[in-house]
A protein has these predicted regions:
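Short amphipathic alpha-helical surface patches that serve as generic macromolecular interface elements
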Residues: 166, 183-186
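Bacterial Sec-dependent N-terminal signal peptides
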Residues: 1-28
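Core of folded catalytic or high-affinity ligand/protein-binding domains
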Residues: 148-159, 163-165
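Hydrophobic core positions within HEAT/HEAT-like alpha-solenoid repeats
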Residues: 154, 186-187
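Alpha-solenoid HEAT/Armadillo-like helical repeat scaffolds in large eukaryotic proteins
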Residues: 138-142, 156, 168-176
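Extended repeat-based scaffolds of very large eukaryotic assembly and lipid-transport proteins
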Residues: 19-152, 191-241
Length: 241
């Protein structure tokens, strides 16, 4: 028993020491993390949808979803709001993510999660696919109004493989070049469509190679930015619709 307690104390000590060794991000880095993990909240039937979500409780499979009769009673725009602000599937990641130093100076290989320990169910992603044109139009409408692309919108764009929205996203990005995750969306679209010039590049190998992980990134600088924009524009022009 004493040996077990000693072992547990040693593990706890190592965990605390590991936490102490993490780099302490700057205020600018922390502010950017808040910026890039923020979801866009559509206004369509928002109070009604939020009231419905507030009454949900998870079932035995840790799924929090509206009963079919309630979901089917929603208009398309209300369903858009529901799906954009609520992930139905519980998918806890047991490994805590360490703080990221200089997050604002990186272009990441992957997007951050929109719903912490939850994610979209197959039914929810199917809604995006089945109503693709309407979903893209509503995303554009919302982004034009709010001047930002929430992480949930980015995830939906990648999920739908919405290549047709590339010119719009580029226009949004070029306004202030603040949201580097728009560049990540471009990378993910080129990857999903197996765009050969990108697959053959050194940046692809670094971002999505065997050693890549959730935090893999390249440095945000003018050269990398311009290369991504050039590649995604070439990809878009040659994309077979």
């Amino acid at each position: 028993m004493r040996m077990l307690m000693a072992g547990l104390l040693m593990m706890a000590s190592l965990f605390v020491n590991a936490q102490d060794e993490y780099p302490k991000p700057s205020k600018e880095s922390l502010d950017y993390n808040v910026y890039r993990t923020k979801v866009s909240v559509p206004p369509y039937g928002l109070a009604k949808v939020k009231a419905m979500i507030a009454k949900l409780t998870p079932n035995d499979e840790e799924i929090e979803k509206l009963p079919d009769n309630l979901y089917n009673s929603l208009s398309l725009r209300e369903k858009f709001t529901y799906n954009m602000i609520h992930g139905e599937i519980y998918s806890q990641n047991c490994d805590p993510m360490p703080p990221v130093e200089d997050e604002h100076k990186k272009i990441f290989a992957q997007l951050p999660g929109a719903f912490d320990e939850y994610s979209w169910s197959d039914k929810q992603t199917q809604f995006f696919d089945n109503n693709r044109d309407s979903v893209i139009a509503l995303i554009k409408e919302s982004v034009t109004r709010s001047k930002r692309v929430g992480v949930n919108y980015k995830e939906a764009i990648v999920s739908m493989n919405a290549v047709e929205i590339i010119p719009f996203l580029e226009e949004v990005y070029l306004r202030d070049k603040k949201d580097h995750d728009i560049l990540t969306v471009f990378l993910l679209l080129m990857k999903a469509n197996k765009y050969q010039p990108f697959l053959a590049s050194s940046s692809f190998k670094k971002l999505y190679g065997d050693d890549a992980n959730y935090g893999t990134h390249i440095v945000y600088n003018s050269a990398n930015e311009q290369l991504i924009l050039q590649r995604v524009n070439d990809f878009y022009k040659n994309y077979k619709r």
